[in-house]
Amino acid sequence: MPTIKQLIRNTRQPIRNVTKSPALGGCPQRRGTCTRVYTITPKKPNSALRKVARVRLTSGFEITAYIPGIGHNSQEHSVVLVRGGRVKDLPGVRYHIVRGTLDAVGVKDRQQGRSKYGVKKPK
């Protein structure tokens, strides 16, 4: 326990909470340009080729973002919208690309959970 004198000298500092998506700078989403689109393999025990993109954000950060859904049209120089949200089995991937906005088209023939993949209601 600190003495009264110690508390007068320097006050108690509040515990600062560290953000899990620092590149967004407190914003819900950020726009960016793809610099590289490639696939990586997940951690054990999973096995797949997960599609990711290296994105240069308007905030100046260069991040790795996951491309959700089946099939995508993202390539180098594509302008994409990035949101927070990590991918548990891909170390270092802490962002998702928002499908159905800017240059990232929605997932083709998606019937359920459409809002998460940028798909309009079928007629």
From Swiss-Prot:
Domain of life of the source: Eukaryota
InterPro entries linked to this entry: NA-bd_OB-fold, Ribosomal_uS12, Ribosomal_uS12_bac
GO CC terms in record: chloroplast; small ribosomal subunit
Coiled coil: none
GO MF terms held by the record: rRNA binding; structural constituent of ribosome
SUPFAM superfamilies on file: Nucleic acid-binding proteins
Database matches in Pfam families: Ribosom_S12_S23 (PF00164)
Keywords from the named record: Chloroplast, Plastid, Ribonucleoprotein, Ribosomal protein, RNA-binding, rRNA-binding
Localisation per UniProt entry: Plastid, Chloroplast
Matches recorded under Gene3D superfamilies: Nucleic acid-binding proteins
Primary localization: plastid
GO BP terms, alphabetized: translation
PROSITE patterns named in the record: RIBOSOMAL_S12
Function per UniProt: With S4 and S5 plays an important role in translational accuracy. Located at the interface of the 30S and 50S subunits.
Entry's family note: Belongs to the universal ribosomal protein uS12 family.
Complexes and interactors: Part of the 30S ribosomal subunit.
Protein's UniProt name: Small ribosomal subunit protein uS12cz/uS12cy
Organism the protein comes from: Populus alba (White poplar)
